[in-house]
Amino acid sequence: MEIFIAAYFLALIVEIIIRAPIDRKRRQGRISERRVTTQEQLLLGLLTLGGFVVPLIYTFTNWLDFADYSLPGWAGWIGVLLTAGALFLFWRAHADLGLNWSPSLEIREKHELITRGIYGVIRHPMYASQWLLSLATPLLLQNWIAGFLNFLVFIPFYLLRVKAEEQMMLDSFGAP
């Protein structure tokens, strides 16, 4: 099972590596509009807790061992495949968005509405990648708390964020 836990954390490291150069360059541009709510910030904090902090606690302490379950090896490998798909979508979405990516709802000067690349096939590939990772996590971590917490927090985040993001895109770029 350690290999599946390692796969989970490797995926998080790969996401950081993919995002870091874009995030660094993005900070140099000027924001022309920002729509960040307290609710969104709270949910982002809970996502960090559920997707990173709790899995770290699970991995390096025995505090959550009472919530462990055991799956056959093939289930963990399905988790690895889902994670690989998630990382591909995550990478492709960042490659296509470039400096148009932002961790919060922001429109930057010279912002473009991206409809090419993966965005020409999947409307929200970044969120699709996180759905895949959320589905993979219980297969990789095999713990009722560490495995499912991120998924449970991602649901309200997704429902809140996509609606607000869609409205911001409509307000900024009009109907497609």
Where are these regions (language model features)?
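Alpha-helical membrane-protein architecture signal
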Residues: 111-119, 128
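Loop-to-transmembrane-helix entry motif
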Residues: 125-129, 176
